[in-house]
């Protein structure tokens, strides 16, 4: 069995309809979480509790250290008691700091209580660019251009997760032929039509991509399906279909994820 469910597909802050990034991926006996945003709260739901009933070990793959992608680590004491949690975090980290140092400093007094005091076993492992095998599953790590060090993850040939990134062409080869691509779609291209300089455009977008950027990349990579993620919380849910329509003009098999709905891989 290979499937995923989006518990969070929004960016920056949760909205009334979307949490920030968290994507559980179930591969047989393995459970991976792509990022740990506020979508982690959905482990209190029926789907979430069912996942935890089936898995005692969970591997969390962090794309980077911005709060909207890691704040859900603070939810571990609520839902993950007695579980073994392996947190894979990109290295080299921001400012040359080790992943364990960054996370231990954040989840410690006076901001929170230390990871060592969580009622679950938490282990932090640095993960570098390149090919890895985690519990028999092939995971490829690819660096991204963002405002801080960020990475994309490719899980075998069925999923590529690339959020919080500028639209650089190097991901085309990395995502080539993947069944599902989940890609940053924080903005609509029309917002930046007047900015012609690429560097100025990238700065205005805070290291993110447009839905059209995502669609072009999916098309060029020969992906099977494109899911638009890291959606802007400044947009209303009723505005997202227009974003989808623009992306579909470039890549017809684009979709807007519905949080809490399973997607099965071939």
Language model: regions and residue ranges:
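Short, catalytically relevant binding-site loops at active-site mouths
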Residues: 146-147, 160, 166-168, 187-189
